């Protein structure tokens, strides 16, 4: 996946990063990041993070059986957990809605949860975009502006809880901001923050709100080049 990711970035995207020391060189960890661009966000992580990682991705943007099959195959090879978004299916074209059944939603979510926990149990690095949607997406996004953030969904916190229960080990969650300078070549700026731990928060909701606030603050920071 890393090699394939380099192809579309030639002369289109440069990446700078700050706070990489917060990303552990080994051991289980979750990066909870802003989602701004449907393509460039993942490519920016490939450029900045040397360690192998796995991204929780959506499949509901597929518009044909061929694209669904191809992306499913690639994601399975890369061991990237796949989820579906119910609102994306309902808002999509009729052809896309026929690719998935209502019963697929819980099946995909449960499979993604199990795979994510398994990856963390293998001391892997997992990247999650808790907003669920980028600001820029040619298929569909509920966001209406470049500066808009959506409420964070609880998936990353649930994954951390389940993994910790299985491993009997704390999983660091690294809030990560993303911002871009546009032009003929886009400049991606990744800003990694200090890790937080589930044990430090009285409730899941407080953890989610803290991480969401940290990601928003980190995304506002202009990295000096």
What is the role of each PLM region?
Residues 11, 26, 77, 122-123:
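Structured helix-beta-strand junction loops
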Residues 22, 62, 87-89, 180-182, ...:
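Residue-level detector of flexible, active-site-proximal loop/helix-junction positions
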Residues 17, 31, 55-56, 173, ...:
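Generic preference for hydrophobic
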Residues 4-36:
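Helix-to-loop junction immediately C-terminal to a conserved catalytic motif
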Residues 97-225:
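Non-catalytic C-terminal accessory region of glycerolipid acyltransferases
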Residues 25-27, 51, 121-122, 169:
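Residue-level preference for short coil/turn positions at secondary-structure junctions
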